């Protein structure tokens, strides 16, 4: 299957043959497993001190005193039990708990291939919430000269020429302050995902693109399901460079 390649000004340059990965069957169930596996891989097992709340000389006075049979200190204050100040926790976190959802290597690659194919389906991309009115084609492939851009304003001009500005505005306007304790823990804002830029190798365009609201940049070799299907939802609006397409041909 061939797809058009666009210059930085939005004009057509020619065509490029897509790898067969863009024809993979859409499997949202496999994609979800792969993304969850990537998310849970970040978690660190944790547990409480086995002796937490147990370091006390408190003893129970037994029955027949008209009071609860909890362990008490010499002053009569309850201790040791979960409802007492300084007592143990009823169900503390266990280091033995399995936090990481494991996934087979072939299944993970199948999920990535399926997510890549979904990014070329206009119905799936639109259903995810992206603004694709006026976008020339999907998948959207741009000239390799894009990787040499240094300034963010240069990248923005390319996005405008390719009719991606509406989706950038959607992401910018969708930034909201979260409710709850997240504001105090370094994750104050909820930020929608916009365009994913996939380049061939590390280049100047990486730093130039990532400063735009909702835009992420990744190399073709580092691309995984969590990038192209964030939140387990496939169909992210993706901009590919010619070099990235060639790297995909080598990878799949």
Swiss-Prot record:
One of its GO terms (biological process) is translation. It holds the Pfam family Ribosomal_L4. GO terms for cellular component: ribonucleoprotein complex; ribosome. GO terms for molecular function: rRNA binding; structural constituent of ribosome. Keywords: Ribonucleoprotein, Ribosomal protein, RNA-binding, rRNA-binding. InterPro entries: Ribosomal_uL4, Ribosomal_uL4_dom_sf, Ribosomal_uL4_euk/arc_CS, Ribosomal_uL4_euk/arch, Ribosomall_uL4-arc. Belongs to the universal ribosomal protein uL4 family. One of the primary rRNA binding proteins, this protein initially binds near the 5'-end of the 23S rRNA. It is important during the early stages of 50S assembly. It makes multiple contacts with different domains of the 23S rRNA in the assembled 50S subunit and ribosome. Forms part of the polypeptide exit tunnel. Part of the 50S ribosomal subunit. HAMAP family: Ribosomal_uL4_A (MF_01328_A). This is Large ribosomal subunit protein uL4. It comes from Methanococcus vannielii (strain ATCC 35089 / DSM 1224 / JCM 13029 / OCM 148 / SB).
